Amino acid sequence: MRKVKLSIFFLTLLFLVGCSSSKFIPENEYLLQEVEIKSDQKGFDAASLEPYIRQKANSKWFSLFNIPLGTYSLSGRDTTKWVNRTLRKIGEEPVLFDTVQANQSMNDLKKALQNAGYMHAEVDLQTKVKGKKLKAIYTLHPGEPYRINRVRYDIADERIKRILALDKPQHAIRSLQSGSRFTVERLDEERNRITKLLLDSGFYKFHKDFIVFEADSARNNTDINLVVRLLKYRANSDAPETNHPRYFIRDVKFSSSEESGIHLRPKILEYNTAIKAGEPFSAAHLQATYNNFARLQAVRYTNIKFKELPDTTLLDCDIQLSHNKPHTLSFQPEGTNTAGDLGAAVSLTYENRNLFRGSEVLRVQLRGAFEAITGLEGYNDQDYQEYNAEAKLQFPRLLAPFLSSAFQRRSTASSELSFSYNLQNRPEFHRRVLSAAFRYRWNEPKRYSSYRMDLIDLNYVYMPWISDTFKRDYLDDVSSRNAILRYNYENLLVMKMGFGLRFNNGRHAMIANIETAGNILKGFSKVLSFRKNAQGQYTLFNTAYAQYIKGDFDYTRLITFDTHNSLALHIDLGLAYPYGNSKILPFEKRYFSGGANSVRGWSVRELGPGSFRGTDGRIDFINQTGDMKLDMNIEYRTKLFWKFHGAAFVDAGNIWTLRQYEEQPGGQFKLHEFYKQIAVAYGLGLRLNFDFFILRFDMGMKAINPAYETQREHFAVLHPNSGRDFTFHFAVGMPF
């Protein structure tokens, strides 16, 4: 509580100091305290023109606290002292109102309004002075916008008319439509549209300056009659005007900057080259060829040149390739620390970037780890050893004959085949995991989307040895432990298929995944009469297989207020259902709550399911898992100073089970009760943003704790107890 009071006092002090920065304001000048932009026209979005205002007031933390200015004001005038230099560096110098910049802002606003079709727009500036502080109010008077009445295309070249489909107005006129507002943006869109169509149709020397617009309006009329005129081609100032020449590709050849020549198979070169002999020149095909070779790890860079054949409209294309080193070998030692247990690990990685001369990437990694475990009693061995061997082979294309070559060329795709073997020896048990997978990945950058399809993902878990002490204490049927724990120390086969997509355009981000396991094996089980074990599960090679379906949906909305302040809204939903050959989900497929990316008032795996408190009131990592998850977060983010950013957040959520388990009382999802079991937390965060990575420190407090029924403990926000409710998180990267 004392720390909280000191923090409040410190923030209040800085706030008060921020209000008294007059010592840095010269005579006859004023601190720009606030800038407002508004319009006299109802419904007009004046805020969208705020970027045209050149002077902004000093930034505020969370859009409320003028602490950067207050920090600067704490400094003295003697800049030879390090304390004054430091305060000025982390603070923010007062913004003094500048009439020159204000007038320039008015001109910029007026020009922006005219470009948006408001030809008779005016902008007024009003200033309100109080002491040494000034508020600037920009008032927009847009007036009546000009609108397009009629559009006519003046194009003499019949070939270009056909390409632009001017005989089909519904296809030709897109941005410039009758009744739409007459704006510079629409003119630019139409100019770019025509230019792109022609550059993709063989007009190698065409550029947008050949397109001009002529606008005519009657006196005192806001209707515009627009003419889109295409200028004739002229090779030079002395040459006569002609129709624009249309160029075709005569030949495509490849060359290399290395003496060893080209290291890729001819079929791979052809597959990644969108430029084809006999076809018209296309800027889109040129860019696609650059993109295709850029994603090949065997290629370092690509340079494409075109050569005109004299007195013809033919082009020869030369694609110059420079290759990467085909082989790399790396060795990496590392130190480990798991809950205070120290250890070491080493890894050796070999990579071949051009295995079959098709830019196939083979990556083989060997890793070994050792850790000394303390605090275990009753076990002969006190060491943890892990050895892992993994091989991945990635093809820079989809190995899918059922997909059209056009789709494969259009998508930035790859296929991946992987195998791994993991050996773990712990004092309590020995575990072996054999994995194999084959998956597709492809991107659609224009749609800000990426996709993943797991055709098969196979995991075989084998437990060759479990210590008698561990069996007696945790796994025996007569023990107080449960089926969930026992299930995770049995041999298990998981064969799943899945699909996932990601979308991110900067404002909206979405991740969706669905996977299912065991259905194919279940079909074979019935047809081939697989054996069943004592629990009634079908087995393959005396090992039960898992059967379930799982779906996840994650959505984030980022609302940016200005360069220093933004709001992030986030929701994460997950549901997994075991059925058929499984009554319990595999442990790694179950959900948990709490932690740095969830409800931050709880540590990881400390919350839920439902109102479950854990075994004997203690954290229970096995039982505090569930079959469904809900996370909801709202986080206000603000720039503080230098690389430091701050955040204030409210989190809510929990996990639940779909079935009633005796060992998880209160954990089952019930429609009439689940909303009462939603946990709520609040807190503050500090982030160090180094651009290429972010260090995050979040401090969360419990507000509503569903594990307790008494009002004092359930509504923790009314009776905060830092020892009971406070949780600190350290993480790398943003939470969502």
Regions from the PLM with identified roles:
Residues 1-8:
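Bacterial N-terminal signal peptides that target proteins for export
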Residues 2, 20-337, 367, 549-551, ...:
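Periplasmic polypeptide-binding modules associated with outer-membrane biogenesis and secretion
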Residues 336-339, 452-638, 648-652, 656-671:
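C-terminal outer-membrane beta-barrel translocator/porin domains of Gram-negative envelope proteins
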Residues 331-333, 362-366, 417-419, 510-514, ...:
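Membrane-embedded beta-strand positions of outer-membrane beta-barrel proteins
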